[in-house]
Structure formats: C-alpha cells, structure tokens
Amino acid sequence: MRNSLKLDGPVKTYLDENELPKAWYNVRADMKKKPAPLLNPGTGKPVTFEDLQPVFCDELIKQELDNDTRFFEIPEDILTFYKMYRPSPLVRAYFLEQALGTPAHIYYKFEGNNTSGSHKLNSAIAQAYYAKKQGLKGVTTETGAGQWGTALSMSTAFFGLDCQVYMVKVSYEQKPFRREVMRTYGASVTPSPSMTTDIGKKINAEFPGTTGSLGCAISEAVEAAVKQPGYRYVLGSVLNQVLLHQSVIGLETKAALDKLGVKADLIIGCAGGGSNLGGLVSPFVGEKLRGEADYDILAVEPASCPSFTRGKYAYDFCDTGKVCPLAKMYTLGSSFIPSANHAGGLRYHGMSTILSELYDQKVIRATSVEQTKVFEAAKLFAQTEGILPAPESSHAIRATIDEALKCKESGEAKNIVFGLTGTGYFDMVAYQKFNDGEMSDYIPTDEDIAKSLAQLPKVEG
C-alpha cells in the first residue's frame, strides 16, 4: 500500500482567464547575438518578405523576420479561442516525487487538455487566423506523430479553411486513429513521401521503402502550397513565428510559479524542432539574457535523431527536398532519415535557429536519451501521476527523473519544471511494443551522420 502523502501546496495551479497572456513574447529582442538569417538558396542572401510571400501568410512573414519587437499583441479572436483550453494547469508531481524518494520538487506544465492532445494548438489557431484574415482558400502542412496536423485541422475547421496534411508515413501507419481525427475535422491526410508530388516521387525513387521524415513531409507540403492558388504553407515547429506563439506556455508557467512563490532551478523540455521547448523556456531565457535571474535549461532529444548533441551548427535546408530556405541550425543534414522510432514529433534533422544560437552560446544545454528508457519513464509517470504521456513528452520525463534522482543522491531540493507537451492515447502501438518487450533502440553511427553532413550546402561566410 502506498504511504499517505502530505501536501505542502496545491496539486494544480490555474491562472484566471483574465490572467491569460495578452501578448506573445519574442525572445529574439533580448538576444544580443541574433539568430542567423534564413538564406535564399538561389541567391545565398538573407530572405526578404517578397521571397517568402509565395509560401507563407503575410502577417506570419512579418513575425518571422522581426528580431526586435519584444511583444506581439494577441488578436482578440485568438484570445477568445485560447480560453476554450487555456490557461493550462501547472501541476506539482507529488506522487512521482514520492515514488522516486527525491527531495526535489517537480512541476509540469500540462498542454494535453485539448482535443489535439498537445501544445500544437497554440500556434495552429494563430496561423489559421492569419490565413483567414488574408482571404486564403486553404493551407498545407506536414505532421509527424499527428498532433500538429490535428491541431491545424481543428483550427482550419474553426475558420472555414481547407486543410491538406502530409503525414510522415511511419506515423500514418502506426497511428490510424490520429489521422481519423484530422479527417473528422475536414482535413485530407496523405502519407509522406507520396506519389502525389514531384518531390515525393523523387524521394521514393532515391529511398525505396522509406518510412519518411518530417523533412520529406515539409517538402511535399511546400510544393503543394506553391502550386495551388489561394493556398499557403504553415509549419508546426522550427520557425521563429511558431516559437513566438508558443511563448504563451512559458508566460503562463512563469506567472503560475510566481503565484506560488517558487523559482525554477531547472527547466526541461523535449526537443524535435523546438516549438515546445522554445515556448516553455523563452520567458526564462529572457530573464537570463537580461541578467535578472539564472536558470539551468535542458533540452532532451531522441538518441535516434540527436541534432543538438551530435549535429553540426551550419546552414542547411529545412527540408529533405531542398526547396525551403537555408537555416543556420544544429543539423544532422537534410538527407538524414531517422529510424522509425515512436516519437514521431521529434524525428527532425534540424533545430530552431533561435534555440540553436542559444545552445551555441551555452545559454541552454542538451542531452539525448534512448526510447526504451523514455518508455520506462512514461510508464512510471502514468502509474504515479494518472496521465498517459505522449512519447515526445516522455523524453522530458526521463530527464526529469534522472535529475531528480541526482537530487536524491546530493540531498538538493531543486525546483524542477518540465513541459508535458501532450497525451499518448493515440500511441498505444508504441506502448504495446514496450510492454511486450519488442521495443529496441536505434542509434545512428558516426558514419551515418558523417555521410549526411557531407552533403551540407556550401555557404560562404
């Protein structure tokens, strides 16, 4: 029988609706060294508003290129939509602490309390709003595990837009119910790489039997957008605009901690392209950059796709088909195809340019973990905290447990905060593999990564 637990504070901390952030925070405004600009692959020069107009919505381009405006006011229609599921709770993981026997205090920001099951809705509704405001017919996008595609399909349905989703093939096959949610919201869902685009045909020819990647799906979605009048491409991670919208997570987290009188010592987030991590940590990074406070910030990525920990900081294509602008980021090479691991949302070869610059400046640090260890942590969390976590989120849980056990050894009572990005109820194939002992770890060899990095584009300067 579990020992009784004495609470020294609330389990859940909710902000009032009137405490919902009224503006997104742009961490670039506080970075003395700004992220390197996107480059036009044709000219090798920084992209302009006009370069991006055929691909992105106009207002989103302005947000993408603006390194100086600290706060962007959130439009009233978006704030009203946010109130359906925000503010989200900051939860004290008392039962996990008890199971670990750690003196650390563990908090998690839970973003899975909406139909999309994740934080992705924060940016999806914003991007759909700007597409509708521009008078577009529809949007195209990619999705890995399906959370982003689900969030976008919800948002386009809300605003009456068409939605075309290219879903990474391995996730399309592993998560059939996720695609049915998207279709319920009116989206069309195509496994990527497909035979419906030129880029998809090329990738299938070069990599027969490939299970796909986010880089492949991005290429197909961009091609589909530029070939259809009245359509634009929207992206669920990586871009500056996405991290801007996701800052609502960190702003709420900081406000809730302040309400509790708690200062975070360590902040942990999973990292694929950077949307969740960037959103969670940006207000804390801002304080750190301004010299107002110090925080230990840890990014956690899959060992099968270790962009930060084994990648190179260089200009690279954001997509496998090499149709997108070049971004300076930690990358494994745009031709790198990760193994078919179960954290589909983290299978991206690169990383946000903002987070890449912060990592290069040692403002944040990173680690990588194997998926079997990730699911061990996920199972313990489910059994103690009553939420079945998404595989992506469980990378942060794994690192949180490891750090809390270090506190057990040292006796430190650190305040650890992590991002629980979403739920894993559509990831039961992955949980089944783990429970049956059939899950294995794939870690790319140095030769695998070197082969991909050898194909990085040559960029002067």
Feature locations, PLM:
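Positively charged, low-complexity intrinsically disordered leader regions
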Residues: 2-136
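Active-site/ligand-binding loops adjacent to catalytic centers
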Residues: 71-73, 203-241, 249, 260-261, ...
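A glycine-rich, Thr/Ser-enriched phosphate-binding loop motif common to dinucleotide/cofactor-binding enzymes
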Residues: 115-126, 239-252, 390-395
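A short, small-residue-rich loop immediately preceding and capping a beta-strand
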Residues: 123, 131-170, 263-277, 297, ...
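Alpha-helix C-terminal capping segments
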Residues: 126-136, 150-162, 183-184, 281-291, ...
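Active-site-proximal loop->helix
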Residues: 148-211, 307-317, 428-436
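Claisen-condensing/thiolase-fold acyl-transfer catalytic domains that form or cleave C-C bonds
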Residues: 271-279, 371-436
